[in-house]
């Protein structure tokens, strides 16, 4: 019988256990969107987690939508991340990075040149986002990408994946979830194109599959995973018929043999069943490693693995607040709660970032 704390073979790498740190935006990058010394410490503290998926990292300057999020499109960023991966590996850990294009989420005011964000269609998200000096503001109406521009965005993902390997990461996770660019192309609530990237399910999935094809060709399918969120409403994500859409996506991904599928089962931080969806039907369409996420407790995670529902279970806030998460889960010890006097995003010092306590030795 499988156990959450047993080693697991993920493509060419062996994980010490089946616990995964989900990608968690912290907005802690330094000048030039380069990871700094505190980021090195933050991830190294969590190296006992079977697999770390480092925070969403933009694939280009125009892919950014929030302050102080790291990139993987300059030599300085690659060098900064190399310090992180070297430190994690020195502690015996394994680390992927999530590659990200925010799409329509940033307001025009966020960009110094006033450039509109890009999206599949010129449909603003009914959501708010943070702009330094202004607080929470409405998302702007994006500009629809021209058909001829899309190949360039695909290439940005390919280049960032190569940069990730050069930075020492064990692999990458493509961010295909939560209303960002790839997810926005998938959904009829945000994609009303009339070219080969819109309309039918096959057309709306084309961009995602082109990104996955390019990235797997560049660095190998055994180093590429993808995250999907079929029914999460975050960032005004909407789709009239998600079941056939995501069944098609998973069938096509099966042909590309990614090293894992990372599925958010519901609305993160909210009800797990916020919309009806048959996740077991998806699972049956994919023969590879199945990773699950969405508020799993210790007991739920154990049951998911022992029952065969999942191969790996990712944790968000528990990994953020508990650098020794695996030990706490194994010993059924209490988990740290988020500090009440600090948020999850931003900051310049260790508080709320690298000062969460470990269990006593």
Task: Locate predicted features.
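Flavin-dependent oxidoreductase catalytic cores
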Residues: 1-361
